[in-house]
Each structure stands twice: as C-alpha cells, then as structure tokens.
Design a protein with these regions (language model features):
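Beta-strand C-termini and the immediately following turn/loop, strongest in propeller blades
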Residues: 1, 11-12, 30-37, 56, ...
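Structural motif
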Residues: 38-43, 83-87, 127-131, 170-175
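Ankyrin-repeat and related helical/solenoid repeat scaffolds used for protein-protein interactions
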Residues: 158, 165-205
C-alpha cells in the first residue's frame, strides 16, 4: 500500500497466518513468516512477479525474519534444542549460521545500517531487555535498564537510534533510545501498540 494507507494490493492469498513482512534494501523483495498448514516457514516474495519461495523450513517456532543491510542474508530467531537463538541464512547458498547460543529466549534481531552490529531482545537477565552485539555474536551488551519489559528493537536507518516496544503496568509503549541505551523517550502509550518499523529515511516510525 501507499504510505497514506491507500492503493492496497494483496500479495498473499489470505488463507494462512502471515507475520512480520520486511522489505529488502531495494524494496523489490519481502521476507515474511507464514504458518501455512500450521507449519512455520520463512518465505521470499518478489513484489513485481508475485513469486513466492520457501527459504527456511525449520522444525521449531520461527520468529521475525529480516534482511541484512546488503540484502544477502536473512536474520531471524527460531527454537531449537529447547531454546530460542538467533540465526542467519545466506540467501545464495542457504547456509544457516547460529549467532547466539544461550539458555534464554533471544529473538527480534535487527542489524545496524552498516551491518556490523545486531540489536535483539533477550530474557537472559531474568526478564526481557534489549541487547546489542557484534554481527558474529560476540561482545554482547545489555542497553535497556528501565522498568518493564522491552522488545522488538529495530535499528534506525540513520544509525543513531533504536526503536522498541515497552510493556509496563499493563500498557504498551513505543519508544526510542540511543544505541548505548541512553536518552530513552516513550513516544506513544496504548494497550495494543507494538513492533515499530522505521521509514527508509529514519525520520518516521
């Protein structure tokens, strides 16, 4: 659809649950999660041709696929061995690489614009908070320390901010913070607002 909500065009048939659609850097492809026949699969969809392709068929729950800044990989999380970790898939050779390996729930990964870092949420501290790490999974740092639960972090295309969802006292908030966790600002307050997404210029959520 257009950014004003008009000119809707359906890309999927609507007979299965489809979640977290994300554009590639050229806006020609979309990756998303579909539960066709109750099986979680990661798809690629060519917007011009309408061609859909399964690129990931994993045995456990899969969450939030998203392109790398160069469009060559998809980053996601899925459940394996009784826990949820972050993985990448090379779209050329379909090789899957495990990025985190921790007895916690790591999910909702998002690359920095230069591809050198990843932000994600994890409950490894005891409750859900936001972390950053290098793209190879090293140097993990927690950056959120406020009250409540933090999730769905997404790096701004400008590289200066991370947007997130916060749940506190039964309410959802959309907020932003600097990449070191400082300067947290809550922008909206509602019971059903979550999972922010940036405009390409990094100025609008």
């Amino acid at each position: 659809m257009d950014q004003d909500g008009f000119n809707n065009k359906f890309l999927t048939l609507g007979n299965e649950l489809v979640l977290t659609p994300r554009f590639n850097p050229t806006s020609q492809m979309v990756t998303y999660l579909s539960y066709f026949k109750n099986l979680p699969r990661v798809y690629l969809l060519d917007i011009e041709t309408g061609t859909q392709e399964v690129v990931g068929d994993f045995p456990g729950m899969t969450f939030a696929p998203r392109f790398s800044p160069d469009g060559k990989k998809i980053i996601m999380s899925f459940a394996k061995d009784g826990k949820s970790d972050i993985y990448t898939m090379d779209l050329q050779n379909r090789i899957v690489e495990r990025i985190t390996n921790h007895p916690s729930i790591d999910t909702s990964p998002s690359y920095s614009p230069d591809g050198k870092y990843i932000t994600f949420n994890s409950d490894r501290s005891g409750y859900q908070q936001i972390y950053i790490m290098k793209s190879n999974g090293s140097d993990v740092k927690r950056i959120s320390f406020g009250n409540g639960l933090y999730g769905t972090p997404v790096w701004s295309p400008r590289g200066d901010l991370i947007a997130f969802t916060k749940l506190h006292k039964g309410k959802f908030y959309i907020g932003v913070m600097r990449t070191d966790g400082k300067g947290e600002r809550l922008l909206t307050e509602n019971y059903y607002q979550e999972a922010p997404s940036w405009s390409p210029n990094g100025r609008v959520l």
